[in-house]
Amino acid sequence: MSSRDKPKTFAEVREEICKRREEMISRDNQKKTKTVAQVREEKGKRREEMISRYNQKKAKTVAQVKEGKGKRREEMISRDNRTKPKTVAQVRDAKRKRTFDHVPRGTREPHAYLRNDPAPQVASVPKSVPEEKDVILDRILSNVPRRKKTTSYEFVPPKHPQEPQWLLQVMSRMNGAGDPKLIIEKNLDSNDVDPRQNRLSIPINTVIQNDFLTLDESRLIDEDEITNEGNMGVAAFLVDQRTKKWNMGFKQWFMTTDSGSSYWSFVLRGEWSNVVETNGLKEGDKISLWSFRSNDILCFALVPPTSSVVESLDK
C-alpha cells in the first residue's frame, strides 16, 4: 500500500483544515473594506492633487499679467531695434569694430580710420520730401480701381396693335367693363379650320396678355381633366365684327405635335366650326383674338383678316 493511499490521521486532517482556514482569513483581510481613517486619508490626498492642478491652471494676478506684458514689450522693442535702419555713424562703427578685430590691440587707432561726420544720416531710408495733401490724395486715388460706367435702360413695354373701333362699340352695347386685352395673333393651321376637330388652339407660350382670367377661372381650368375630354371648362362668348354671338368653352389641353414634342395650350370649343364657316376662315389666315368682360362673364372678340370679312359680307 502506497503512502498516498494510506489514510491520514486525525492530527494531519486537523492541521490541513487549520492551514486552509489561515489562507482564507489572509485572503479576506486583503479584500476587506477599508477603515474610515484610510478612506479619509485617500480623500485628502486626492483633494491635494486637485488643488495643485488648479493652482497650476488658475488665472494669473494683475501683477503677473503686468510683468508678462512688460517682458513682451521689451522683446518687441529689442526686435525693433535689431530690425530698424541704422544711421551712417552706426554702420561705420560696426565696420570699424569688424576691422579692429583683425588688428592687434597695440596698433589700433580709430581716429586715423574714421573721419568726423557732423550730420549722421539714415543709411537705408531715403529722406522724405513733404507733399501737399492734394498730391497725396491724387496718388492714393490713382491706385483705386475706377468703377465702370453703367448705362440705365428704361423699360419700354411692347407695342400692341390698337383695339378695333367696332370692338369698343360692341363692349358698350354689352356693358363691357375695363379695357380689351389682346390674347393672341396667329395664322390658322389646318386643325383650326377642320370642322371635325371644332376647336381653336391658343398655345400658352404665345399668349400676349395672360391676365385675362380670374382666380376662380384659372383654378377651374387647372383642375380640369388632362385627358382633354369631359368638362366644358370656363363658359364664354365669342363675338365678331357683325356683333354675332356664339357660345364657347375655354379649356386647357395637353397637346402633342407630329414630331413628338408636347406643350400646353388653351382651346376654344363649342360653336367654333360655325364661326369658321360664317366668317369664311381658311388655313393661313391671320386672326387676332381679344378678351373683355361683360357682366363678369368672359368674352372673346375675333378680328378676322380683311379679305374674310369682305367675303362674309358678300354672302
From Swiss-Prot:
Q: Which UniProt keywords apply?
A: DNA-binding, Nucleus, Transcription, Transcription regulation
User: Could you tell me where this protein is found in the cell?
Assistant: Nucleus
In terms of superkingdom, the source organism counts as: Eukaryota
- Which InterPro entries does the annotation name? At2g31720-like (IPR005508), B3_DNA-bd (IPR003340), DNA-bd_pseudobarrel_sf (IPR015300)
Q: Which Gene3D superfamilies match?
A: DNA-binding pseudobarrel domain (2.40.330.10)
Give the signal peptide, or none.
Answer: none
What are the DNA-binding region positions?
204-306
- What GO molecular function terms would the record report? DNA binding
User: Which residues span the membrane?
Assistant: none
Which GO cellular component terms are attached? nucleus
* Chief place where the protein resides: nucleus
| Basic and acidic residues bias (residue ranges) | 39-51, 66-83, 100-114
List every stretch annotated Disordered: 24-129
Q: What is this protein called?
A: B3 domain-containing protein At1g05920
In which organism is this protein found? Arabidopsis thaliana
